[in-house]
């Protein structure tokens, strides 16, 4: 049995949005889940960066896999492009989930020891959580 937990990469067009969502999600895990913010371009502008996504995947993977949450459609394209050439793409799941709620739900599930499929499912199911 391993102590590895599923890692999470948050891919946003905004470095600040990714960092803020990562900070919020980290609060619910008590620091037990690796959450990487991969936001903005390499030169600090709005957009996405394949290099940041690839680094994020490597940093987040402790052996249990990585769930990636993108903020908008073109972030999905960036992640998919990275996964085409990524050495261990089978250990990565791209979640179709609300960005903030999905990040928190994924983190809670990863912290509880959920496997990669459970973590991705929790992120995706967060879309059904009612606020009012």
Where is each model-derived feature located?
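N-terminal loops that bind phosphate or other acidic moieties
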Residues: 1-132
């Amino acid at each position: 049995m391993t102590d590895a937990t599923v890692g999470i990469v948050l891919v946003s067009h905004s470095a600040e949005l990714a960092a803020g969502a990562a900070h919020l999600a980290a609060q619910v895990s008590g620091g037990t889940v690796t959450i990487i913010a991969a936001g903005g371009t390499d030169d600090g502008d709005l957009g996405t960066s394949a290099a940041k996504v690839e680094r994020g995947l490597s940093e987040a993977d402790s052996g249990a896999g990585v769930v990636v949450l993108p903020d908008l459609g073109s972030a999905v394209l960036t992640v998919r492009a990275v996964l085409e050439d990524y050495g261990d793409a089978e250990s990565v799941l791209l979640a179709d989930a609300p960005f903030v709620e999905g990040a928190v739900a994924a983190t809670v599930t990863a912290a509880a020891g959920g496997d990669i499929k459970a973590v991705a499912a929790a992120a995706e199911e967060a879309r059904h959580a009612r606020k009012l």
